[in-house]
Structures are given as structure tokens and as C-alpha cells.
UniProtKB/Swiss-Prot annotation:
Similarity comment: family membership: Belongs to the elongation factor P family.
GO CC terms, sorted: cytoplasm
GO BP terms in the entry: peptide biosynthetic process
Pathway where this protein functions: Protein biosynthesis; polypeptide chain elongation
Molecular-function GO term, any one: translation elongation factor activity
Superkingdom field: Bacteria
Annotated protein name in UniProt: Elongation factor P
Main subcellular localisation: cytoplasm
Pfam families: EFP (PF01132), EFP_N (PF08207), Elong-fact-P_C (PF09285)
Keywords: Cytoplasm, Elongation factor, Protein biosynthesis
Species for this entry: Streptococcus pyogenes serotype M28 (strain MGAS6180)
UniProt-listed SMART domains: EFP, Elong-fact-P_C
């Protein structure tokens, strides 16, 4: 059992027969009354997200999640296809369940597939990935003074804020946990 106050982003637990993944968690202390935990959660099986609050002392059954090495093969319609690199088994995962992760991976990328018992529930991507800039505004001379950066669309469709000197066609290292630019590759 795990208390609501110990839940952090990325953890998975069971509640009312549902398998729930924490997307965001924060303590909130209102002016009057007790502390509450505000959370943004995702139902792992349906892919739906919702916001809720819990008392910090509420307890939940922590889900045991196993991972296996896999390779992203391709996406067709509403399904993403992955292959276990040890056994060569193929898995079909609804795109709604891995929509965010697909922004960080290209075909043939290495990932880890998450299992709850024998059920495939999601994908874990590496902490950093190398992606190519598909489109961005051209650099403007003297624009380095502000240092605010500019948006860039990467080859997967992900949009990140990058420094002004980045141009289309360059390879970048992206932090997948925060969705931010790290450096040029």
C-alpha cells in the first residue's frame, strides 16, 4: 500500500478496479482545512485523463509494472506496433495510450514495453533522444541578446523551444521527461 502523499509523476496504482498512472501530483494547503493532494491522472486501460484530489493519508495498492526491451516498428491508423527484442513477439498498443511517447521516438527506436501481469499498458522512452528539426523560423542576426529562443517543430511533430541559432535540418538532443531542448547532437 502507498499513501497519496508519496505518489509522484510516473507511478502507477490501483483504485476502484482501475489501473491509474500519475501524470502530475502536488500538495495543496488551502487557507482553512487540511492539506490535499491535487493530481492529474490517466486511466491506463482507456487512456482518458482526469483531475482529482485525495487526502494525503489515503492509501492505494501500488501496481507492479514489469518492463521488457522492445523496438518501435510503425504506427497504422490508431495502433502502434512494437516488437520484443528478446523474443521477437509483436505487440499492438492503442495510440491513445502512447500518444505522448510517440512524439519522442522514430521507427526502429529502442524503448521498453510496460506490462501489468500479462497486459501491455504502455511504453517507456529513453531519457534523451536525438531528433531532427523539420521546421523553424530563420535565425535573425543580433537576436541573441534576448535569449528567449524560438519554437521548432521536430520530425515527429513535437514542438520545443530552441535557441535562436538552431536551423532546420539540424539534429538535437531532447530531454523526454520535460520535453525540452538539451543541446545539438
Amino acid at each position: 500500500m502507498i499513501e497519496a502523499s508519496k505518489l509522484k509523476a510516473g507511478m502507477t496504482f490501483e483504485s476502484e478496479g482501475k489501473l491509474i498512472r500519475v501524470l502530475e501530483a502536488s500538495h495543496h494547503k488551502p487557507g482553512k482545512g487540511n492539506t490535499i493532494m491535487r493530481m492529474k491522472l490517466r486511466d491506463v486501460r482507456t487512456g482518458s485523463t482526469f483531475d482529482t484530489t485525495y487526502r494525503p493519508d489515503e492509501k492505494f495498492e501500488q501496481a507492479i509494472i514489469e518492463t521488457v526491451p522492445a523496438q518501435y516498428l510503425y504506427k497504422m491508423d490508431d495502433t502502434a506496433y512494437f516488437m520484443n527484442t528478446d523474443t521477437y513477439d509483436q505487440y499492438e498498443i492503442p495510440v491513445a495510450n502512447v500518444e505522448q511517447e510517440l512524439l519522442y521516438i522514430l521507427e526502429n527506436s529502442d524503448v521498453k514495453i510496460q506490462f501489468y501481469g500479462s497486459e501491455v499498458i504502455g511504453v517507456t522512452v529513453p531519457t534523451t533522444v536525438e531528433l531532427t528539426v523539420a521546421e523553424t523560423q530563420p535565425s535573425i542576426k543580433g537576436a541573441t541578446v534576448t535569449g528567449s529562443g524560438k519554437p521548432a517543430t521536430l520530425e515527429t511533430g513535437l514542438v520545443v523551444n530552441v535557441p535562436d541559432f538552431i536551423e532546420a535540418g539540424q539534429k538535437l538532443i531532447i530531454n523526454t521527461a520535460e520535453g525540452t531542448y538539451v543541446s545539438r547532437a
